């Protein structure tokens, strides 16, 4: 098996058709079929189901596709680093962030990459924190800013900052912003919580899973959309537990208020994560440094109300 065979395999997988795949990689259809057959012989298992209208990947084909993408990307990055020479930041890098991370440093990160690293192609993915972690676990992103990630042996995590969570909503529901509210009182409020997929609220909400479970029991709605959540809050459909950064624009405009929660205070921790089996490239090292620098700057200037983890 070599890189050419993997490229051919990926073309067939993505096109689901030998003829279209052959056109994509510019080889004869018979030659492409021969390479796929050789791969199947090497793995001793079918990679595709041959049908009259195309080719569907088998379970083995699905697994090989994920590995092939990672292998070819690693090879391309290795070639770029060797060709460009030491410490030249080039190639491709993909970074995943939760909404808060993008809101705080996304624009400046993109601006810096465009101006300082013209040979680097950045892909920035925004999603809920749980989805961001999944993007990292399947190697769709190289680095990820994730709240309260689980302890997984596959992950290398670096605590970056700690944020306080507030009760956020319209004054009629939340009450006076200057007066703290006790945690036990939250159960009497119409809470709307973010949810990722079919599971419970994202671990990103709180550091304490026991408190998170108690909040879950009080929720009247769950949302898998930042836009939907914000709209519901402004319309007074409910209130939520969030950071001030989450609703920064609405708080500044007076459409929403944030009320401190006490007994206990609610916090969450942001981590910079990467996969343990993914070697650090020059680009990854530089983006890690840049992201940490931008975050620290936002915290020092008060734009991101949080405490840096030393």
Description of each model-found segment:
Residues 10-28:
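Short helix-boundary/capping micro-motifs
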Residues 40-57:
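A short LG(V/I)-centered, amphipathic sequence patch enriched
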Residues 42-43, 64-86, 287, 291, ...:
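Alpha-helical linker/hinge and terminal dimerization helices associated
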Residues 90-153:
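Central regulatory/effector-binding core of bacterial HTH transcription factors
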Residues 128-133, 137-140, 146-147, 197, ...:
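Hydrophobic hinge/microswitch elements
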Residues 155-192:
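Flexible hinge/capping segments at coil-to-helix
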Residues 190-213, 280-282, 288, 297-306:
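Secondary-structure junction motif
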Residues 244-253, 263-310:
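C-terminal effector-binding regulatory domain of bacterial HTH transcription factors
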């Amino acid at each position: 098996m070599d890189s050419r065979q993997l490229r051919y395999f990926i073309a067939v997988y993505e096109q689901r058709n030998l003829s279209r795949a052959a056109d994509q990689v510019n080889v004869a259809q018979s030659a492409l079929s021969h390479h796929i057959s050789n791969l199947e012989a090497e793995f001793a298992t079918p990679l595709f189901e041959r049908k009259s209208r195309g080719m569907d990947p088998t379970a083995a084909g699905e697994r090989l596709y994920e590995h092939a993408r990672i292998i070819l990307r690693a090879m391309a990055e290795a070639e770029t680093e060797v060709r460009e020479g030491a410490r030249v930041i080039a190639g491709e890098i993909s970074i995943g962030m939760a909404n808060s991370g993008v809101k705080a440093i996304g624009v400046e990160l993109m601006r810096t990459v465009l101006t300082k690293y013209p040979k680097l192609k950045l892909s920035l993915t925004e999603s809920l924190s749980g989805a961001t972690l999944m993007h990292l676990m399947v190697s769709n992103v190289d680095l990820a800013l994730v709240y309260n990630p689980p302890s997984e042996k596959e992950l290398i995590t670096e605590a970056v900052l700690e944020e306080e969570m507030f009760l956020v909503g319209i004054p009629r529901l939340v009450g006076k912003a200057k007066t703290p509210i006790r945690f036990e009182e939250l159960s009497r409020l119409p809470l709307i919580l973010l949810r990722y997929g079919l599971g419970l609220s994202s671990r990103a909400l709180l550091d304490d899973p026991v408190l998170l479970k108690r909040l879950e029991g009080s929720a009247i709605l769950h949302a898998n959309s930042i836009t939907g959540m914000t709209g519901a809050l402004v319309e007074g459909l409910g209130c939520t537990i969030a950071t001030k950064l989450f609703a920064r624009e609405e708080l500044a405009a007076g459409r929403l208020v944030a009320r401190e929660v006490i007994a206990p205070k609610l916090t969450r921790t942001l981590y910079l994560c990467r996969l343990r089996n993914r070697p650090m490239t020059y680009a990854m090292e530089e983006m890690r440094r840049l992201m940490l620098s931008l975050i620290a700057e936002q915290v020092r200037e008060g734009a991101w109300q949080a405490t840096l983890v030393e």
